[in-house]
Amino acid sequence: MPKTKHWHYSIPPEELDDERTAKAFIRELRISPKHAREICRAIRGMPLDRAKEFLRRVIRKEEAVPFRKHKKKVPHRRQIRPGWDAGRFPEKAAREILRVLEHAEANAEYKGLDTDRLYIKHIAAHKGRVIRGWIPRAFGRATPFNTPTTHIEVILEER
């Protein structure tokens, strides 16, 4: 019998206090794993309200996300936080991560947690499967056109 894939969070459930945490997990988002990773790194540890406002500013192109790992040929930005220079405005990834944060906030509200005291304890982006596609070209050839997907997990904790 083939093994089935079991989805789980990076943090084991024994390390979490169910009374003070809320979780959300979205799979197979059609966003760049590199953009998602950089956004997750930028907002990890932030209070929830501040993280949501940061993502809204990224979508409006008012503040850039610092690109620390995937920064080759990334231009320097004036709209970036002090201490870093290379950055981008990954709107699509920011919109999807904002949606995941809103799901986690709704879960926290359902559990009776105070949403004003929530902060992002854990957020991570993992590569998902690649959706394969082909573009027909001249003389009967074809070029691969692959779409990466990303899994995002969020754990909010009440302070």
Swiss-Prot record:
Matching SUPFAM superfamilies = Ribosomal protein L22
Does the keyword section mention RNA-binding? yes
PROSITE patterns in UniProt: RIBOSOMAL_L22
Which terms under GO biological process does the entry name? cytoplasmic translation
What job does the chain carry out?
This protein binds specifically to 23S rRNA. It makes multiple contacts with different domains of the 23S rRNA in the assembled 50S subunit and ribosome. The globular domain of the protein is located near the polypeptide exit tunnel on the outside of the subunit, while an extended beta-hairpin is found that lines the wall of the exit tunnel in the center of the 70S ribosome.
> Which UniProt keywords are present, listed alphabetically?
Ribonucleoprotein, Ribosomal protein, RNA-binding, rRNA-binding
| Quaternary structure, from the entry | Part of the 50S ribosomal subunit.
User: Pfam family example for this protein?
Assistant: Ribosomal_L22
Species in which this protein is naturally found: Methanopyrus kandleri (strain AV19 / DSM 6324 / JCM 9639 / NBRC 100938)
UniProt KW Aminoacyl-tRNA synthetase keyword: no
Recorded protein name is: Large ribosomal subunit protein uL22
Per the similarity annotation, which family is this? Belongs to the universal ribosomal protein uL22 family.
MF terms from GO for this chain are: rRNA binding; structural constituent of ribosome
Q: Which Gene Ontology CC terms are recorded?
A: cytosolic large ribosomal subunit
Known InterPro entries for this protein? Ribosomal_uL22, Ribosomal_uL22_CS, Ribosomal_uL22_euk/arc, Ribosomal_uL22_sf
